[in-house]
């Protein structure tokens, strides 16, 4: 973070786009301020291509005049029902910016809310009114764009001090802020996660108190914020805040339920919630994409329902991977996440995440690795990344043994992939030929015959060639009474 004087801020805003807005503001005799994330990111020294401008007057009028001056190189969108307008500038020639730029204009306003809706009642207001309605102090700072005050920082809630101290706090009483717009509770946690800030105590207490209000927010908006938390550098910060606040119990009760340690006869299982956060952080170290992170977050959600006590061996979670995979679609629907190949990918990784561990815990055989590659297909590398991340044992000897065996599994996988085994492992005799040969329609018998051939190829008991496979097929068909 870096602090700037008003004169230095004026130099940072010494760009054609801001001078154009300044000229328009003075021409229309209105006050204009750049606000919100753009101002915050100036002090955080982060790039930002989205500019929010508050106009004490008509934001639409300023946007229309700016578009007229920019000409064809800009695109204007007006949203009269909301009193806002957006100017998109695709070229840097008129703005001095390095790439595409979006400037959103809104008239200064005051807002009030009913208890069961996050749609505000809006009235015209002053800059102070507009700053009052902002979600957090670090987003409530404004910089004047009018010529006579160009670069002047307006910071009534000490947002700059909170930014310097790494604090998330609200301009108004936080209970009012969160009740008015409960989505701000997720945004609060998201900013704390992205910026690695602390949530101020009074603000967090209000968040805990108001958590139930999140239920009036649409699934789509919740899902967007959850994905932003997930893509942070350290998403575990956000999920720990979600758990402590009570929001996780509402949004992802399957994950929240893992936050328990049960002990019996002196034997305790680990806290699978914090284990999950550790696994998530481990995949993030490998720059994991969004849905691999979701797979890491959900990989153990089946453990709560599969937990059993065995006097001989202690706590068990048999088939938690299988049950967890079945739980994924309901979670994706609840959070309005895509129910397409992305969801199936997460299901697949959750279901298969124990497979490499089982292989690594035993002798690493060619047959087991061939089966793993065949079943995982193109997702094998992500599966291995997840499984390696899942090794969080504090027993360094055991951890070293698993990781060494995983290295051997990866070597064998590399050899198989180089030989194009994904293609070679598919038997040369397919289901259509089997149905034609034995005059069958699609049925259980066809599946058994196909699986017989596939198992033989995967186990390397017969070469993937027509003559030996045909011999095996006829033997199996005769055993089943089909020939």
What is the predicted role of each segment?
Residues 1-483:
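Catalytic cores of the polymerase beta-like nucleotidyltransferase superfamily
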